[in-house]
Amino acid sequence: MNIILFGPPGAGKGTQAKFLVKILNNFQVSTGDMLRDEIKKDTDIGKKIISYMNDGKFVDDEIVNSLIEKVVFDSSKKGKLIFDGYPRTIAQAKNLDLLLTESKQQIDFIFFLNVNKETIIKRIEKRKVEERRGDDDLDTILKRYDTYLKTTSPVLDYYSSKQNFYKLDGNLEIDQINKQIRDFLKL
């Protein structure tokens, strides 16, 4: 089963994806992790990525889509993908549709974690201390949140009319959000 988890930065997409990986034995496709991995490797792509992230901007679709393509066409992961933070733009959503069609797959569930700005700030401040992520300073997060609102709203419109779309209250506690997801998945 292929699943999309999307919502603003700090919504808990990664946390919920990790739960689903354990329950379903699926693979987490975290664009954030993939991008940070490129930065760690100090590749040319990694250097481009860091400039986007430091400016609070989304990384160019072409870069992100190329990383996603490798995962979608990995036969060992077919039908077992949990997309965490992808797609973020209409171009990415359409690219994902195309890749899945070409690889004879589909999205089974789309979960939108709807979270208010105050909750996000609290979560990011906590995550900054616990995980020491460089992209978690408040100014960068606020820029990413504003970029998210402008860029990802059309993606919400794109998916919200689909039968397998579920809007969840992402302001709830982690276990409550997880229960909502498990209920929809009938787990």
Regions found by a protein language model. Give the residues of each.
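Glycine-rich phosphate-binding loop of ATP-dependent small-molecule kinases
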Residues: 1-187
